[in-house]
């Protein structure tokens, strides 16, 4: 099989169906965009095993956008305590307050509006849009950059903007029309 020409996403999806981990933020179908968002922010620079109890506790305290938006920053930081990188919690809190005020508590369904939220970049926007809304959006993080660089024999610096764009285009070529979020999760 020539990996450069073959559309291999069905193989990855089959593998993920058999081997994907059972995680609390994957419990619902369709997925709640708020829960996807919280999990993705918590998982930045943090292992899944570490995040799991924090996520469960967070959802007990702030199960919805209105609940988090109404919380004080002190409450938010208290719930985040132990996860580190506290700017993630402050940014999430501020962004959720914006979603509550500007969008009536509904996470926007277009990339431009999602990316305008504090602390949300290309990866998180792609994850929210693909996982919660089923949109064909790539979620490319450092792990995906490394995987695709190996698969496609890319030797240039994967952190350079041109190479990131090249790899994102390759991911987009592989994204299936059905279940793009599942494909993104399988890559992660």
Model-derived features with residue positions:
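Catalytic cores of DNA base-excision repair glycosylases
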Residues: 2-6, 10-11, 17-188
């Amino acid at each position: 099989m020539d990996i450069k020409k073959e559309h291999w996403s069905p193989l990855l999806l089959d593998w993920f169906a058999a081997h994907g981990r059972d995680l609390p933020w994957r419990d619902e179908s369709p997925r709640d965009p708020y829960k996807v968002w919280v999990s993705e922010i918590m998982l930045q620079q943090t292992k899944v095993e570490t995040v799991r109890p924090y996520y469960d506790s967070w959802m007990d305290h702030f199960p919805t956008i209105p609940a988090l938006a109404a919380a004080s920053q002190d409450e938010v930081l208290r719930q985040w305590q132990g996860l580190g990188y506290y700017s993630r919690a402050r940014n999430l809190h501020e962004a959720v307050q914006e979603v509550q005020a500007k969008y009536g508590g509904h996470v926007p369904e277009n990339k431009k509006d999602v990316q305008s939220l504090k602390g949300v970049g290309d990866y998180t926007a792609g994850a929210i849009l693909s996982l919660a809304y089923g949109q064909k959006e790539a979620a490319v993080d450092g792990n995906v950059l490394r995987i695709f660089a190996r698969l496609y024999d890319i030797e240039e610096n994967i952190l350079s903007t041109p190479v990131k764009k090249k790899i994102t285009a390759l991911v987009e070529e592989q994204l299936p029309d059905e279940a793009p979020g599942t494909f993104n999760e399988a890559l992660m």
